[in-house]
Amino acid sequence: MPVSAKLVTKYGSKKLLTIAAPLYVIALTNLGLAGSSWHLALSLFFFGVIGNMANIAVNTQGVDTEKLYDRPINTSFHGAWSIAGFAGALVGLLMINLHIQPYQHFMVIMLLSWINVFFNHQHLVSGQEDKDTKRPFFIKPEGSLLQLGIIAFCSMAAEGAMFDWSGVYFKDVVLAPQSLVVLGYASFMVMMAAGRFIGDKVILKAGRKRTMQASGIIISAGMAISVLFPNIVAATIGFMLVGLGVSTNIPSVYSVAGRNEKIPPGIALAMVSSVSYLGFLMGPPLIGYISALSNLRYSYALIGCFGLLITVLVTRSKAIN
């Protein structure tokens, strides 16, 4: 994260994204060529490093573009990411059914990505390069940025619970038939994507603070319904609410962090992302640990409390308005 932030602020997100995006798909293709565990481990390492650079750069682009439009649009960009996830899954399914090898699949994606970057990099926002050459390499997040990071941490923990444990929850707690085990995850993803495409209009009408306050309550309500009524219909509705609740949080946090007046957007986004991704990494193992001591319903109840914490933190935040 600090390296990505330094590169974005020194050279600008446009330059970094134009370089990182083609390298990202090269790293992806290298995964398909891995012939040993060491090769795979190194490939995954570079895939993560370059992917993080692209992530910070593209989110900085989103923040800078939103500033130019002077209205909420960043949530829709994240909606496009959600749609790309669905598209990637469908393409992967098609490739499997056609018996195409992973490296061939990845090479097709690499070619399409290169074409995309070649024709569209000129439309990226130039942004501003950081002129402060004495800025320290690592800046500890504090104050409003730390608060934003904790809000994002809670939201990412809820996302991680859905990504990694929704299938297990539907199988072991809801006791859904095998054909419906993926229903919870699918309903969550659909509502998260839908929420992101309508989120900007909601933020414009209701305000960012009220929208984020409501999102925390919606996350908690969704988790509560899933825990208290562990049947297929209620759990599906609950997971849909969680998807709707988390849909606007991360884009909103990035937008607010990128508008701070003390440090460049790239560094601010890296700070917030460093804290938030801990939620994505720590949330699922925490759920597994608690469920091993008791059961998965208690784990989901705890994640539901994170939603209320989001509402409290947003209410107390002076940076969010």
Stretch-by-stretch model annotation:
Residues 1-12, 96, 195-207, 291:
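Helix-to-loop junctions at the C-terminal end of transmembrane segments
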Residues 45-46, 142-158, 240-244:
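Pair of pore-lining "gating" transmembrane helices in MFS-fold secondary transporters
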